[in-house]
């Protein structure tokens, strides 16, 4: 294929030029080309192509813009898509790391294999296979809805490990890009920021083969992927032949738009059913031949992407609520929202009685057309923090409750859709939604600490406040109740006129309040909220006004009396809230009343029957309603959340975690060792490069005074180049980093003699507390020996003195001295003294080596341990004024330095060693 010939596509335009065929292509082929070229989720690819009328070039351009805007805050990807991954395998790059940007899953086929081979699922294939078999046997005992044990997976406590190992595990298991994107959008872990008693939830890395929804659900419960397609097959079976099939279909059709024709509904339902199949996706090539198993036969099978209705069906299979954390809009390169994301919200198993369901929800994350499991982390003190999932967003607005309405078996599509009375009976009020949440979950109100509690929510402008949302909500709720409680068939026209007048009156009141608030300066926002609260808000006179209007329109006295009661109760909402909060601990949970849970009535029947009396719910529901209304008005003192039960685990949980940690430790050690080898190789390469360039600069160094010649090494210009090369690399070890940090700070470093090294520029003689000359000269010897040994066997330890040596030489050339450099030079030099011989001066000799302004002062303050050194010094003084004589490579074998005729073509160090050897030979003669 054309895509396999491109190792690294630079942009979407290049892909468009190569993949776009001017001929009319089958939609499946176009979709396949788009997915193959970008690695995007098929669901996102289909949306982009449909938005551009299946124009591949335009869709690829939009995708490129989306990728660019979302990679601003995330690491950049150098190779995108499945084709780039194939080319990457052919041309491996050492140290190359690929991370997923915001709009491209890191879980294309190649990356999925990499992830799955390192995750908990593959820590021990025997243990995981045994666990899968056990789960499959449990699932086969039930017919269609799998009787799932209430398992909730938790990550092990990673705080007990070192920071490096913890970071390694987090990169291995956690979907970093998803976590960053959702946290920045304010959708994930905002509750742990405002309330420290709440645990953070972390998205687990999930493979992206089209089955990510069920993989994520399996990971969230058991810790392994749904490789055996147990959940996928159960999903398909329930949608095809399950007892709840018709009711689920009605709920799905009700939530969809009413724009489809009758024959289109069946076709849409058939397509939806086909998506749930466990059969891999089939792609048709341009010549009409079909290929199964993804893009080509060599890859793993790719399944059809699932939609939000499949999440709702999955909740019935698991018999437990599902909460999906997702952003609400997909945005283009300019930040403008161009497509909604409908997945976020709450999915309840409404076709199963609450007393037969698990109350602990399964929590999933959805980002970039990809699902991930959201799990918490174990802690030593489990009582200190609790695992919860808020049922509101960060603005304390209730999350969407998906597919909550079932019109019933007797609903006639196309006829009853125009009956306003029947439509009004199907509208769920806020109280009804809260009652469903209390029935299916263990909900709790978590108190927000006063120190992290946000001040009273202020409107962004005097004309756009939270009160408007509350007021519109109150209007819709009251209108729904009025439609239910009144005889709307007889008073339809009259009620419509009265409601229109009432709405105009409220708009006038709100406008008056805003105009007053605008004139009051800094006090306008708070006063504006209070005026709206009294004139048109949820906690003010709105219920009283509606009650009086209903009474004037001929409504019965019971309705007016009920509205008055609602008015008084809403006015007392803050008092009830404060009273309840004083007696409620942060961990205390409010549960539905026993009568609600004991009743086995269908939720649909319960919902329709409850609308006749909006206040028949339990006290917990009314308390939740009052607190939620107060939160929407700005008094945000609590978080409305569902409790996550993490105490139930399957019997193979501990074994899986143990095997994974053992495997991760081995891989971590291997990775660290590989990094050390790479660092040593890079250091050797840098040293070799510097050595090759050294001869061109050597005459300048040889023309310097004797003290400089006593330190064989590169010149002042060349060491700077070497230092820059070494600084571009990371430190090879923590010890070197610590020493470099101490050196940079000017700290004194203990030398071989045990004393702290300190020096001041400008001193010319011996000074008490000054470092002895031996350690300084030893560091020079150590550097040369290390440089000589690196050619044979480069080691990590050889990098450290080599990196400090040019700094010493540079300090001599610039006629300045730094105590930090002195401290850095003298580290780890004792072990290099052994080859120096017994005559080398020890640390106890009180000889000073001082660096000061001027070469003469520095020369006068230096002494040498051997007798022949002054001769070399005088020779250096003779050649000081002009360029040095011709030089050649040192005569000693394997020595990388250069010598001159005065030193018999030995370098200065080898020359001293040769003189010492001769003296010893003469002394040994009889």
From Swiss-Prot:
Residues 170-413 are annotated as: TRAF-binding. The lineage of its organism: Eukaryota, Metazoa, Chordata, Craniata, Vertebrata. It comes from Mus musculus. Residues 185-452 are annotated as: Catalytic. Zn(2+) binds at residues 890, 895, 907, 910. The keyword Protease applies. The gene is Otud7a. This is OTU domain-containing protein 7A. The modification Omega-N-methylarginine is found at residue 880. Belongs to the peptidase C64 family.
